[in-house]
Regions:
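Alpha/beta-hydrolase superfamily serine-hydrolase fold, recognizing
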Residues: 1-194
């Protein structure tokens, strides 16, 4: 592949550097940066946040991180698992990580529940619903956060045919979407107060 997951991480950190360098011009507080992502963006955000606190992981990805720390994450319907024996994992890994990723230094990090990755994360608010086709990804990832005593919260909506994958992004005017955005904002405010 011409453009891999590692390139996406590099782009993310270039954007974060821009925010760090120029955010003050727009009255932003560059020491109070929070991140929200959905689906594949939630996965990218998770990995980039972990790389900020795990130099071994960043080196394995050959990524130069931006030191502006992400204070907390909002992860909506995260596509955390990319190498499972399912629709995502059957074809995606070689395109994301390269054809030889299993022999690379990054190989252990492909598992998002790898202890060194999980313990490098800032506080996380996870959002899913019973009708999210990746519901099991979020709940399994939440178990890893619990196992390693990482600060987090799970917002898991009940069965409702309107609350499909990343519903708060695709259907922003649903009451549950408003509730999701409000919950993320309140969680970030709590983290800021600590």
């Amino acid at each position: 592949p011409e453009y891999t997951f590692y390139h996406q991480c590099t782009d993310f950190f270039q954007a974060l550097r821009y925010v760090q360098d120029y955010g003050n011009l727009y009255y932003g507080k560059t020491d109070e940066i929070y991140g929200v992502g959905d689906s594949g963006g939630a996965m990218l955000l998770t990995y980039c946040a972990a790389m900020q606190n795990n130099t071994e992981m960043a080196a394995a990805a050959q990524v130069s991180v931006c030191p502006a720390p992400l204070q907390a994450l909002g992860l909506i319907s995260g596509m955390f698992y990319t190498n499972r024996f399912d629709q995502i994992g059957l074809s995606l890994p070689k395109y994301l990580y390269g054809t030889d990723y299993k022999q690379s230094d990054f190989a252990p990090y492909v598992n998002p529940t790898y202890q060194k990755l999980v313990q490098a994360l800032p506080p996380c608010l996870l959002v899913t619903s019973k009708n999210d086709n990746l519901h099991h990804y979020t709940t399994k990832f939440e178990k890893a956060l619990t196992k390693y005593n990482m600060p987090h919260r799970l917002l898991d909506f009940p069965k409702n045919k309107q609350l499909t994958h990343a519903f708060s992004v695709f259907e922003p005017f649903l009451p549950e979407s408003t509730q999701t955005i409000q919950a993320i904002a309140e969680y970030f405010a709590e983290i800021h107060e600590q």
